[in-house]
Regions:
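Periplasmic polypeptide-binding modules associated with outer-membrane biogenesis and secretion
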Residues: 18-27, 33-37, 41-54, 61, ...
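Second-shell loop/turn segments in exported
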Residues: 48, 65-69, 136-144, 188-194
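Extracytoplasmic segments of membrane-associated envelope/inner-membrane machinery
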Residues: 104-177
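Extracytoplasmic
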Residues: 41-43, 54, 87, 97-101, ...
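N-terminal positively charged amphipathic segments used for targeting/anchoring
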Residues: 1-38, 174-230
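Extracytoplasmic/secreted envelope proteins and their assembly/folding machinery
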Residues: 56, 60, 76, 80, ...
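Soluble periplasmic/extracytoplasmic beta-strand elements of cell-envelope proteins
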Residues: 45-49, 93-95, 101-107, 119-120, ...
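Solvent-exposed coil/turn segments that connect beta secondary-structure elements
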Residues: 51-53, 88, 97-99, 107-111, ...
Length: 230
């Protein structure tokens, strides 16, 4: 009798082990299936924020996600690396949200001026005018001798004021070798030096003092206005 009881106990233990193995396999199969299905979930929405020059479509294509690939397999690092190959793009931040949404935050280089269809950016790099940018000051002088300082200084001009400048001419005199003339879209003329370039950011206030007349604004020295005779 004792031997039979031992045999039954062994059989029961073996059955319990088999059940455990079976349930473990089922569990692993379910986990694997869920992971496979989740991995197959594609990107459903792509949001591009902060770009003004580079089009959304180009950003998505350059990032390598224009075919809306697997959300999980999409690498944020890869997107950043690909996008920063574009000379116009300064910084990129990527966020993945809600298991299917990609947010791409773009910081572009500031466009300083245009010369011979070459765009000068705020990092002192000249690039091709790939995006046909025209609402930017045209540089009509050779500034090679002070290019770096010119770029650094002009980049301090507020964007809305930069849009008001039609042309920039390098016009040094005996007093200041860093003197420039800004020809405004409204017909006014501004003399300024690189060291005092931020004064132009108050242009709207200065312009209001002209009361609709045209004039020459001297911000290089004296800060006064010479009204043009009509």
């Amino acid at each position: 009798m004792g031997k039979k009881a031992k045999v039954k106990v062994k059989v029961k233990k073996r059955k319990l082990k088999l059940k455990r193995i079976f349930f473990c396999l089922i569990f692993l199969f379910l986990i694997g299936g869920i992971f496979y299905l989740v991995k197959k979930i594609p990107i459903t929405n792509i949001y591009i924020i902060g770009n003004n020059i580079v089009p959304d479509k180009e950003i998505i294509s350059s990032a390598g996600i224009d075919n809306y690939p697997s959300f999980i397999d999409t690498s944020k690092k890869d997107i950043i690396t690909r996008l920063k190959r574009n000379n116009y793009i300064k910084e990129v931040k990527v966020e993945k949200k809600l298991l299917s949404k990609i947010y791409i935050y773009i910081t572009e280089h500031k466009v300083i001026s245009l010369s011979n269809n070459k765009i000068l950016l705020d990092n002192n790099t000249e690039v091709e005018n790939t995006y046909n940018i025209h609402n930017v000051p045209i540089l009509i002088s050779d500034i090679s001798s002070i290019k770096e300082k010119y770029t650094k200084s002009i980049s301090k001009i507020d964007d809305d004021i930069l849009l008001k400048i039609s042309q920039i001419e390098y016009t040094p005199n005996d007093v200041d070798s860093e003197r420039f003339t800004l020809y405004m879209n409204d017909g006014n003329q501004v003399y300024i030096t690189l060291g005092k370039v931020t004064k132009i950011n108050k242009y709207n206030s200065i312009y209001s003092r002209l009361e609709g007349k045209k004039g020459i604004i001297y911000l290089d020295s004296g800060d006064y206005i010479e009204v043009k005779e009509e």
